[in-house]
Amino acid sequence: MKIAIGCDHGALDLKNALVSRLEAQGHQVQDFGTYTKDSCDYPDYAAAAAKAVAAGECDRGIVLCTTGIGVSIAANKIRGIRCALLSDVLSARMTREHNDTNMMALGAGIIGEKLAFEIVDTWLSTAFSQVPRHQNRIDKVMALEK
């Protein structure tokens, strides 16, 4: 799977750990930065990753900041993106099964590396349920962009 990833300075260490893990699992990762701990603006990196997913250049995207809130808001401003802020494994599974999310956000100050790995693994391995009522709800949400 080709995965877009982006973060701000507050989540650099977790992003780098995720990149290494994802590549070791055989995923292709497109890293949109940031690459240093210098203070930066999270919307720049979240938008870059989200645009790659929306354009079909990447299959899914992961964005990170200290809480995950800012990057999830920014990613969801890009047409075609359904980004969920995740802090537990159940939500990771449910957001794929019910919402067919194409991006996820993590808060590096909220969860540790081990839990982040579990959340990402679950989110990447869970398929959309294909249940008609879930698709209907997704269609209604996506129609709000028009």
Q: What kind of feature is each model-predicted range?
A:
Residues 2-6, 10-11, 89-146:
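C-terminal binding/interaction regions
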Residues 4-24:
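Glycine-rich phosphate/diphosphate-binding loop of Rossmann-like nucleotide-binding domains
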Residues 6, 32, 64-65, 86, ...:
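Structural motif
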Residues 16-19, 74-77, 117:
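Short amphipathic alpha-helical segments
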Residues 28-39:
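A short beta-strand-loop structural module common to alpha/beta enzyme folds
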Residues 45-85:
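Helix-adjacent hinge/juxtasegments
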